[in-house]
Amino acid sequence: MISVIKIFFALLFVLILTSNLFAQDSFADQFNLAKKLYEDEKYFDAVTEFKRLLFFYEGDNYSYESNLLIGLSYKEAAKFSEAIQHFALAELNSSTEAEVYESRLEIIKVNILRRTTQRAFTLLDSLENDVRFNKKSEEINYWRGWAYIFSDDWERAALTFSEIQKAHDLALICDSVDNDLYNPELAKYLSIVPGAGQFYTDEYISGLISIGWNVLWGYLTINAFMEDRVFDGLMIGTLLWWRFYSGNIQNAEKFALEKNLEKTNSALHYLQNDYNGRKP
């Protein structure tokens, strides 16, 4: 009787062990399937499979990498809030300093992409002040440069990249963009002389039109006062001359801002499509 009981428990143990082994193989297959979907750029399918794995698997073996790849999938789909959520979960499930660093860096990159750059700067400072990552200062500075790019501070971006390498490709690009930008305040002040602000922003036709209207209404206003037509002079001066004079100032500043936007968008388009280095 005792031998029968022993055999029963031995068989039960073997069955349980076999069941666990099959389950482990099943989870490994599920993870590999999800990872393959991610590599094939089927991001939403990958997210579904990773989440299915995390729901059924009670261990921690797949938690870090699954959450990291879910975050990267959401990032590719421009679902930035969801991406940050899963990068944060990846950090919580990290087991090495390298994993902590990678997950935090991904959160920073997403903040750069969605232009919450102040948050990115705060996280970069936190990362830089962490003694565990003292040897990562150059890479941290690299992403700080990108944060300056996305906050439209091309001058500081150029300075930041040049700290890494004097003739860094991105330093040269950012410096070129910064030198090519118009100064909206200068355009505004130049427009005290009608048309000068437009000439500064290469809007020559607009500048000539502005000069023409201001000369015309200025002449008519002054002429009205000289002929003692005070009411006419006031009406022409306030309703027409002042309107065109103030419009000339506003237009010059607007042209500078619009052209700067075109230039920065063109630079960002180049960086996105033609720059071969690391990007957020």
Feature-to-residue mapping (PLM):
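Hydrophobic alpha-helical membrane segments
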Residues: 65, 79, 99-102, 109, ...
